[in-house]
A protein has these predicted regions:
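Hard-cation-handling environments
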Residues: 191-245
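Membrane-entry segments of alpha-helical transmembrane domains in multi-pass membrane proteins
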Residues: 18-22, 76-79, 154-160, 234-236, ...
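Hydrophobic transmembrane alpha-helices and their helix-loop junctions in integral membrane proteins
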Residues: 1-194, 211
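Aromatic-capped, Gly/Pro-kinked transmembrane alpha-helices
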Residues: 218-233, 255-367
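Alpha-helical transmembrane segments and their membrane-interface junctions
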Residues: 126-142, 203-224, 294-298
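Hydrophobic core segments of alpha-helical transmembrane domains in multi-pass membrane transport
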Residues: 31-34, 125-129, 160-164, 202-209, ...
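Alpha-helical membrane-inserting segments
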Residues: 13, 17, 61, 209, ...
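Hydrophobic alpha-helical membrane-embedded segments
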Residues: 85, 243-260
Length: 367
């Protein structure tokens, strides 16, 4: 998924920000950044993940250059990267599935028991390294050629160095120490058939795109004016790859992986978490304890006394008034009840008396 989902950002950049100068330099830094951290990595999955950063850097730089060739290169490289990076992760996953280990310092000697996995992995390694007749050669080189055509010598140099570093670590260091190198005596075997079939399909596509790039070129957003298989281009690419291989042989001991954990930007939140824990355990905890003490010694007794006073006011004041009114009404009702005898003559007499009283009142008022 990581090989696929990272391309959504490239798509957004290509649609919204082609030709943005800042992206050229961000992409160039990304291409080198991933390679530099891959040098330090011992975990095969993290090593491949760092090269995702590097390869996406090519795409971002291509979008930033913004010419038709550069955008075509970024788009085609995004498509090719999904295939060969998926193949590389499947190869590493097959090794982890077979051995339960993922550190290069714990692997080695697997070529005897996992030859198909080695062969399929190397197809992906050649593709990401831009070997001729593999998919990366016909896509990645388009971005570099666009930078050269746009007279960006520094960008061309940086992207070429990143390509060399990719071959050094993904195409040489990782397979050497994972499949060859010191035999660790691991009892491994080829992964299940469905895993091999998936790797095989990805490998076939990596080779097919490298040999027949025109169907992919036909899908690109602009007409393609780029020929990857020129004598000069093939010679330059093979020269970079050969010198990289020579450097690997010469500095093999220096490139031996060490059983360490590489710290990347996670250094910041590791340090931040340490200070956060100190803050939570010391000042914040002390503040919470002080608030609890004040609450227990001052606030809670005050609240209890206030509640008692409120209860007294309710019982002696509010309830007394309400109950007093109710008693008065009850007594008044009892007194009035005695006036009602139920005899018709008494009722008639009361009505006559009431009428006489009303007439007398009106007479007095209207005088």
């Amino acid at each position: 998924m990581s090989a696929f989902t990272t391309k959504t950002a490239v798509y957004v950049l290509a649609r919204a920000f082609p030709g943005t100068e800042l992206l050229v330099w961000l992409g160039t830094v990304m291409a080198l950044y991933g390679v530099v951290y891959a040098v330090l990595e011992n975990d095969c999955r993290r090593l491949l993940a760092y090269h995702i950063v590097s390869q996406v850097g090519y795409m971002v730089a291509g979008v930033g250059i913004g010419t038709e060739m550069a955008v075509n290169g970024a788009t085609s490289h995004a498509f090719a990267h999904i295939l060969y990076k998926g193949l590389l992760f499947m190869g590493a996953g097959a090794v982890i599935h077979a051995t339960g280990r993922r550190k290069l310092t714990e692997l080695g000697g697997l070529y005897r028991t996992m030859p198909l996995t080695v062969a399929l992995y190397m197809v992906g390694a050649f593709a990401i390294s831009a070997f001729p007749f593999f998919s990366g050669f016909v896509t990645k080189s388009m971005v570099v050629a666009a930078a050269q055509q746009d007279h960006r010598a520094l960008v061309v140099l940086a992207l070429t160095m990143a390509s060399s570093g990719t071959f050094l670590h993904t195409g040489l260091k990782l397979p050497y120490y994972m499949f060859f190198g010191t035999d660790r005596g691991l009892q491994a075997r080829e992964p299940p058939r469905n895993m091999l079939v998936a790797m095989g399909l990805a490998a076939v596509l990596c080779i097919a795109i490298g040999v027949f790039p025109q169907p992919l070129y036909a899908l690109l957003p602009y007409p393609v004016d780029f020929e990857p298989y020129t004598g000069m281009h093939v010679t330059e690419s093979l020269g970079v790859l050969m010198f990289t291989a020579l450097g690997f042989v010469m500095f093999l001991k220096a490139l031996t992986p060490e059983n360490t954990i590489s710290i990347d930007t996670d250094w910041f939140y590791r340090k931040g978490a340490r200070y956060f824990m100190w803050l939570a355990e010391k000042p914040v905890a002390r503040y919470e304890q002080a608030v609890s003490n004040v609450s227990a010694t001052v606030a809670l007794p005050l609240l209890h006394e206030t509640a008692r006073a409120g209860l007294w006011v309710d019982l002696t004041g509010v309830d007394a008034a309400v109950n007093g009114v109710a008693r008065a009404i009850l007594r008044g009702g009892g007194a009035l009840r005695r006036l009602q005898t139920g005899i018709v003559t008494h009722s008639a007499l009361a009505m006559i008396a009431g009428v006489i009283a009303a007439i007398a009142i009106f007479a007095v008022v209207w005088q």
